[in-house]
Curated annotation (Swiss-Prot):
The keyword Cell membrane does not apply. This is 3-phosphoshikimate 1-carboxyvinyltransferase. Monomer. Phosphoenolpyruvate binds at K20, G87, R115, Q159, R324, R365, K391. Catalyzes the transfer of the enolpyruvyl moiety of phosphoenolpyruvate (PEP) to the 5-hydroxyl of shikimate-3-phosphate (S3P) to produce enolpyruvyl shikimate-3-phosphate and inorganic phosphate. GO terms for molecular function: 3-phosphoshikimate 1-carboxyvinyltransferase activity. The active site is at D293 (proton acceptor). Its main location: cytoplasm. It comes from Thermoplasma volcanium (strain ATCC 51530 / DSM 4299 / JCM 9571 / NBRC 15438 / GSS1).
Amino acid sequence: MIVKVSNLGGSGIAEMPSSKSFTQRYVLASAFLNKSVVLNGITITNDDDVAMRIAESVGSTITINNRSIKISSNFKCPEEIYVGESGTSYRLSIGLLAASGCVTRIKGEDSLAKRPIEPLLMALGENGVKFERNEAGFYNVDGRNSQKKHVEIEGSSSQFVSSLMLYYAKKGGGEFTARNIKSIGYVYITKRVLYDLGYFANIERTITINPTGVWKTAIDVEPDYSSMAFFMVLGLLSDSVDVRFRIKRISRIQPDSVILDLFKNNILINGEEIRVISGINEPVSVDADMNPDLCPPLSVIGIFSKYGVQIRNYERLKTKESNRYEGIIDLAERFGANVEDNGQDLFIKPGSVRFPDVISYKDHRMIMAASIASLIGGFPTVIENAEKTAKSFPGFFAELSKFANVEELA
């Protein structure tokens, strides 16, 4: 899909999608752990749909009713699962399949097969799980001899740690050691999901999982703060829009909820409503190790705010769905911003502003960042591959149309 964005201005409540980090974990854990549940407040992203298809392949029946999903679990080992381009579903499913004693072939998109997985395979291998790389670049899992010994894992991805947490939950409990956990906030999301489904996780250097015997049958899934960031940036950089959000329960479990702290002087909270006040009055700094998904939207601030943006520990961005380190630099330079790289951090500041006529990315977050930058720049811009935003935010352009003109060209 190709769209043109222009004419920024308007007032409204931007409706955010549910957190796919929570949703995918709830769906997969419910299906594999045989805990039937109703999830409320759901927006089905492409990644959520992948998790739901995996749940169906392991015997669950899924019923969708408006923004609720009912998962009726009846676990069975699948011969094959398809993980699309969802790193979360891929990595979490490996641990769950292994713990379940399954012999399963995994398929997915080529781009995902290239992303790191080895630390997880090594840790599971120490527990007797066998892996064989298939012609698609993914791994066939053989968990028939899986055990629950104490192992160690390198936490270079929080998804590796979360996968092991689910592994030991499926095994009825256990413990393991995690070293140097990156983006630990996502591990706490997994802890919350396990707690809601009847398991207590104690997270220290040694992570311990134990069943509690009590779980919820209906769960409200909170909205996604990384998606909120795009519209927050829109409101921060423009006084021609009045951007508001409505959140039933403001939770701080999601790592990306840090945006409420970063811009505490620019938001007004009144009950369930959050209102964005325009104006950036100080430099913005974000840690890519902790909040990689905030880097694309916040980089737009660097393009237009005289105070600039610092993206710390940018190496993390190179192993996301695309090389977002390169994508962020490309976007900034397209709009004429100055970018400095000291080998660890990126610094983005305004330069001689340019206005690209057409912008084309394949990464969903870069497409959304480009759309926001185009509107702040004030020049009509054609955005290609607009459909790819459905990976995390299916209604992005519908919500954007509350504050600008969005014309579908093809």
